[in-house]
Amino acid sequence: MPKRKKQNHHQPPTQQQPPLPEREETGDEEDGSPIGPPSLLGPPPMANGKPGDPKSALHRGPPGSRGPLIPPLLSLPPPPWGRGPIRRGLGPRSSPYGRGWWGVNAEPPFPGPGHGGPTRGSFHKEQRNPRRLKSWSLIKNTCPPKDDPQVMEDKSDRPVCRHFAKKGHCRYEDLCAFYHPGVNGPPL
């Protein structure tokens, strides 16, 4: 690095300023050329790194301080990177789902760790339990023993069907897994 600084100190700043617009233009192109990333490592930070250069004083602040080399890095590359390689890197090319919000090493949106959390997981389990109960009652009631086809199962030990209690009927009728007073058990 010190060798590069010495070499760049001998070059006039007017020669270093024209490559910056060229790099911005090539960084905006869609060809994906690797010209954008070397601008961070190459001459542009070195050209503005001169403490006596009046153009570097505009970008860095106080001309005598050599410490803040990071502001030129942050102020120069974002024009080519903001419209070019970074957006493409976070977009559909790197992410298989075409969404750049998760970043480059992002997981797919649904199998990720946040989807199977305790609140959503318990919600899905609570939602599936009545379905399992209904499917079990469908299997039990549609496949009765061959010797006794018309026997109603006594479900008085099960909870009362909410819909039957409110409306007086249930759309599942005798296939419902819950207790219908007077229909699939003794009346209350």
UniProtKB/Swiss-Prot annotation:
Disulfide bonds listed in the record: none
UniProt keyword Lyase present: no
InterPro entries noted in UniProt: PRR3, Znf_CCCH, Znf_CCCH_sf
Biased composition (Pro residues): 35-46, 69-82
Biased composition (Low complexity): 83-96
Residues covered by region (Disordered): 1-157
Alphabetized Gene3D superfamilies for the sequence: Zinc finger, CCCH-type
GO terms for MF: RNA binding; zinc ion binding
Record's keyword terms, sorted: Metal-binding, Repeat, Zinc, Zinc-finger
Iron-sulfur found in the keyword field: no
Zinc finger (C3H1-type): 155-183
Bias-annotated ranges (Basic and acidic residues): 145-157
Protein name: Proline-rich protein 3
Organism encoding this protein: Homo sapiens
Gene: PRR3
